[in-house]
Amino acid sequence: AIPSTYRSQISMGLPSEIKPEDITILGGLNFEKGKIALKTENYTENDAVKALLKKQMESFGKTNGTFVKYFPASTLMFINMGVKGDGLYNLLSENKEFRSTVSIAKADEVKELFNSFNGDISAGLINVTMNSAPTFLAYADVKNGNALEALYKNKQSLGMRKGEDIMELGKDEYVYKTRGMNIFFGIKDKQMYATNDELLYKSIGKTVDKSIKDAPYAADMKGKTVFMAINAEAILDLPVVKMLVGFGGKEFKTYSDLASKVSYLSVSSEGETSETD
């Protein structure tokens, strides 16, 4: 039996008629040259679970790799997924936690934002330092910029705190200002973007010389609905990590030596099958 502590965590967000024990995960571990792969697949005889899994599959589609050219190969963590916005919103709207978070006043705006998604969504953790918030970059295929325009026009209803504001920088260009950081976001050529780095904002839509297309895991992304990669080599090369290893004693050195044996870790999903490499 699943301990009650873990049961509540696993069950969070699931419909009441679905219990974790109704879902069986079948897996196999393969050892290949220079690679360890864990493949898993969901199995159930519960009709409610089957219906939920079907809705999940209908909310995602195969990725096209539209945005990989904008992310450097040194990206620390990269997530890529193919999204059908209207299906995803319908799926989330059945989630009790989601409904309690999104108020009735904001429901239409949130629905329009989700419905605008139509294709790839890519996000990456670009850099981590001791002096500022981690740098991120995100892109999404969208139908139009109506959702962001509506968000800006109705910003007074968003319940922003003192010191927070959304300012218009130009047509379909905005910045969300807080005391801690600025988040630049907007629409360019039917591509939504967001970043908290001004230099990245100024180069939105420009390809980088050595991109994720050249990363060792690039070929593994093809045909997947969801893909995530953690670049162990790039993380170990961060100045902040090198400093921790240098001053952290034997324990940090041991972890660093273990991590140095790994090039990258990837997790992907294609239909009901998931793979971890």
Question: Where does each model-flagged region fall?
Answer:
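Single conserved position on a long alpha-helix in the C-terminal lobe of the eukaryotic protein kinase
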Residues: 1, 115-224
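Leucine-rich, highly hydrophobic segment in Treponema pallidum outer-membrane-associated proteins
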Residues: 1-82, 88-90, 220-277
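Generic recognition of flexible, low-complexity loop/linker segments
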Residues: 24-28, 64-68, 109-113, 120-128, ...
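A mature extracytoplasmic/lumenal domain signature
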Residues: 42-44, 83, 127, 144, ...
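Juxtamembrane segments of multi-pass membrane proteins
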Residues: 93-94
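Extended amphipathic, helix-rich lipid-handling scaffolds
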Residues: 99-114, 225-237
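Non-transmembrane, amphipathic alpha-helical segments
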Residues: 105-109, 177, 213, 272
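Extended, charge-rich low-complexity interaction segments
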Residues: 105-110, 188-206, 249-265
